[in-house]
Swiss-Prot record:
Pfam families: COX15-CtaA. PANTHER family: CYTOCHROME C OXIDASE ASSEMBLY PROTEIN COX15 (PTHR23289), CYTOCHROME C OXIDASE ASSEMBLY PROTEIN COX15 HOMOLOG (PTHR23289:SF2). This is Heme A synthase. Its main location: membrane. InterPro entries: COX15/CtaA_fam (IPR003780), HemeA_Synthase_type2 (IPR023754). Pathway: Porphyrin-containing compound metabolism; heme A biosynthesis; heme A from heme O: step 1/1. Belongs to the COX15/CtaA family. Type 2 subfamily. Keywords: Cell membrane, Heme biosynthesis, Iron, Membrane, Metal-binding, Oxidoreductase, Transmembrane, Transmembrane helix. One of its GO terms (cellular component) is plasma membrane. The gene is ctaA. Heme binds at H270, H327.
Amino acid sequence: MTNSSALSPSSSAVAPRPGALARWLWAVALLVIIVVGVGGITRLTESGLSITEWRPVSGVLPPLNEADWVREFEKYKQIPEYKEINLGMTLAGFKAIFFWEWLHRILGRVVGMALVVPFVWYAWRRAIPAGYGWRLFALTALVGLQGAIGWWMVASGLEYRTDVSHYRLAAHLLTALFLLAGLVWTARDLGALARDPGAPPARLTGAAIGVIAILFVQLLLGAWVAGLNAGYVSSSWPLMNDHFVPEGIDWSGGAWLALTNDPFLIHFLHRWWSWAAAGALLLLARTLARRGARAEACALVIVVAAQMLLGIWTIVSGVSMWVAVMHQVVGAILVAVTAAALHRLGRRSAITEVS
């Protein structure tokens, strides 16, 4: 055997390693939850517009000297947020908000590298089981799309607005949560394959799609609450400023505009749709328990209860930053736990897939 053939992908190939792939995806899922948390801090500290350019490579390093800091600060001074809200901000104040946006972007890159590098390695070693290559590629590509959506979101606040579009913020957050769910689902499939080489991948049931739809609405409303700062319109619970249906809803532009843009109405809907989401998830937990998956059922009940309590605490605290961040982090954990629960109840039938 020649040296060149010894180094070829075919000769270095190993048997598929679904267990190792599953552990890798679980680690990346944890990273995604961390990024979601830092994203919440970035939003709540109003740091998201502090970096006015998208430099995927050169932007890795922060300003390294005073001249670089002044240059970055001058760029920030050109956007409406500085002129209308932060006029007079000191360089020290700018450095504080710059840090969180920079960290959020760096962690996003870390997630990207944590997917791309192992994926290329496992693909080169031919260690990816048949039927999973396309799925792992899609998850890896989704990180790149998420980065582009993040910049698209930031760009919405650089010219005419003092904040980002709540529609784009929702797209950014929901894409991250979709990625998280995909990582968990695929990790569970690979874990099952590691235990049983003949295990087929799980498929969503009709009931599962219904649960996802209900949860999706709640997550969308939560993202809009965040993007519109709607959490601040009421700090009382269960009533909103002594009313069940809050005063202050602007219906002048029509019902659809109010439904998608009015902070009072969106806060109200997020507050009460949470009970529909909780009910659907508790029914899911009941089904899990009846089918012997008591650990998954207990985990789901605990996370649902924690998220409901954190939501109420966020309201009555007047959107205390760390409480609100925990609400966002536990929301991400809830997505992961729900994905795992739905996978446990998924349909399984032997099918032929292509890698």
